[in-house]
Amino acid sequence: MQIYKVGGAVRDRLLGQPVTDIDWVVVGASTEDMLIKGYRPVGTDFPVFLHPLTNEEYALARTERKSGVGYGGFVFHASPEVTLEQDLIRRDLTINAMAEDKDGNLTDPYNGQKDLQARILRHVSPAFAEDPLRVLRVARFAARYAGYGFTIAPETLGLMRQLSASGELKALTAERSWKEISRALMEEQPQVFIQVLHDCGALKELMPEVEALFGVPQPAAHHPEIDTGVHVLSVLEQSARHKHPLTVRWACLLHDLGKGLTPEAEWPRHIAHEHTGLRLIKAVNERFRVPRDCQELALLVGQYHTHGHRALELKPSTLLELLQSFDVYRRPQRFEEFIAACEMDARGRHGFEQRSYPQADYLRGAAEAARAVSVQPLLEQGLKGKELGDALKNERLKALKTYKTSTV
């Protein structure tokens, strides 16, 4: 039995990055051998075990053969006869197909170290094209390592285009797709993930609503970048630079989907795109079974982001409706995330990246003014039910009128 550290742990060590997760592969062992040594089986599709002391995952060396469509269309074979090289060749990229023994000796049969030094993301073998999930994985790695100067090898990008055109991306489950998308959006340069999917034709298959934004013009006075797709990439880039959470990044990606529905005759204006885009945002959310907090914020940002930009011009009654739509009294964090998405939208325009966004503090102040209204005096007057609700709304409206007068 020989045990090797494989994949990301080896790659990250060679890159000088912190190693967080460690994967191990075991060569020359059977399931019975692992059980005798106290390892606990956890794998369902292939033999994976937890170390009895560290709880790290140890997988038996295995081969795989394509047997159907999609990510799950494979037959796996694990036995003591499977070599380390056979196990490594089934991996996606050469930089992920290296192994280290307990003494730190490197096994690198597919030149992963060379590609690491050359900053190239290259597939290990033609079998890459058998797994559609790898299109998303490579795009995610491109987003992760763009800051290090990594690019995708032309031949690998060619296979990604081939996979995208094959229709196999549609066989990916919502869960697997969202796992990759959500991880990619939390990388340092998530806009690279979307750009790569666009370049290889995968965005058209996975999120045609986002793909439709490329080539759609906006007024140059407000959007020097003009292209709506380019704008969305810039907004996403800003959301990562400001370290915003997944909810905000997802909302940034989807906020302008309605512009893809604007008739060409109306370009570059996009009247009511906030409302026309809602059904598209809902469709994307449902397609990937997106978590509820991400769904809700994306819909709210899509509907109200122009309210955010015009915050200082809004009538107090409109401002009150906005605050109530976000339930700022019970969910203040969601309104804060809305403000963040609006600010990223404003900064995601070429030449506006460093421009101040006074609407942010104004909206925060408005929320604070409305929240400061106490219901207690109204209760002491004996009000209840609809009468109480109407009275509380009127008091909040008064507070917002006072706030607007003293601020704007």
Swiss-Prot record:
Domain HD: start-end pairs: 228-329
A Gene Ontology BP annotation from the UniProt entry: RNA repair
Cofactor note: Magnesium is required for nucleotidyltransferase activity. Nickel for phosphatase activity.
This enzyme's EC code(s): 2.7.7.72, 3.1.3.-, 3.1.4.-
Reaction(s) the record says it catalyses: a tRNA precursor + 2 CTP + ATP = a tRNA with a 3' CCA end + 3 diphosphate; a tRNA with a 3' CCA end + 2 CTP + ATP = a tRNA with a 3' CCACCA end + 3 diphosphate
Domain of life assignment: Bacteria
Job of this protein: Catalyzes the addition and repair of the essential 3'-terminal CCA sequence in tRNAs without using a nucleic acid template. Adds these three nucleotides in the order of C, C, and A to the tRNA nucleotide-73, using CTP and ATP as substrates and producing inorganic pyrophosphate. tRNA 3'-terminal CCA addition is required both for tRNA processing and repair. Also involved in tRNA surveillance by mediating tandem CCA addition to generate a CCACCA at the 3' terminus of unstable tRNAs. While stable tRNAs receive only 3'-terminal CCA, unstable tRNAs are marked with CCACCA and rapidly degraded.
Notes on the domains: Comprises two domains: an N-terminal domain containing the nucleotidyltransferase activity and a C-terminal HD domain associated with both phosphodiesterase and phosphatase activities.
Family: Belongs to the tRNA nucleotidyltransferase/poly(A) polymerase family. Bacterial CCA-adding enzyme type 1 subfamily.
HAMAP family named among the record's database cross-references: CCA_bact_type1, CCA_bact_type2
This protein's name: Multifunctional CCA protein
Organism (species): Pseudomonas syringae pv. syringae (strain B728a)
